[in-house]
Amino acid sequence: MESNDIIYQTVSYIARHFREEMSLERMARDLGVSRFTLSRVFSGTFHRNFNQFLNEQRLNYAAIHLECSDESITDICMNAGFESQRTFNRVFRERYRMTPREYRILYKEKYLREEQT
């Protein structure tokens, strides 16, 4: 498999499966490549490791749902593929410098201000 094919397959696979329990080993097996090859794709192409890339996809999903839905934060966390609310809160805070609850409140306040102008 060519490098560009592996990159495409990797992005496509994660887009389809990020909400499920996932590991580098399982993904490599499903794509028919070695763990080492897949690990090189993440570091060389995306400049991050597998878990960092996966968490980014999950956080993007969660942020959209925090902004646009009234789902509970726990439901959003679980639907995004995080195994625990504790992990979700930690990873979310690392990226956004606030809790998911604070993010939701901030976004809704911003949205209300924009509607009033």
Features from the language model and the residues they span:
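Terminal helix-turn-helix DNA-binding modules in bacterial transcription factors
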Residues: 8-16, 21-25, 44-83, 105-117
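Short, surface-exposed linear motifs at loops/turns and structural transition points
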Residues: 28
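Short coil turns linking two alpha-helices in DNA-binding domains
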Residues: 34-35, 83-84
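Short hydrophobic/aromatic patch on the recognition helix
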Residues: 38, 42, 87-88, 92
